[in-house]
Amino acid sequence: MKVRIAVAPGGGPWSAESYCSLVDGLEARGFDTIWLSDLPLAPAVDPMVGLAFAAARTSRLKLGANLVPIGRNPMLLAKELAQIDQLSGGRLLLMVVPGVGSPSEREALGMPGADRGAYLDEVVPLLRRFWSGEVVEHRSERFSFPGVTVSPRPVQDPL
């Protein structure tokens, strides 16, 4: 049986010590996956930072990211995720979601609620193109990539 743990912000402040203990405990007890959510205004570890840390500290634990791409450059996001997949030996799991439900978080990220789906429709294919190793030529109202290639590629194909 696989047991996966999703880490959500609690009632108290986040601490490096508690996260370190959690990661070590999950690995030692044979849990399958740790999932971190992208909650920019919550007192929680950022998924990119937390999963990179967990990748370096564990050898077996799968690393799940529940990411909101809004406010992130897709080229840099593709590179960061590919590097976490590389550093972990292919243990990254990814769930991309259209955005947070909180109006204050949407406003802080600069994304009206009505645009979340369209944003995701543009970003997900871009991530896949960057991970394929192809030269990406893309221009839109949101992004402009004048023939760029992202390296390294993820271990997993497809990620």
Describe the role of every protein-language-model region.
Residues 142-150:
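Active-site glycine-rich loop that binds ribose-phosphate moieties when present
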Residues 1-58, 62, 157-158:
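N-terminal beta1-alpha1-beta2 module of alpha/beta enzyme domains
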Residues 151-159:
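Short, intrinsically disordered, charge-balanced linker/junction segments flanking boundaries
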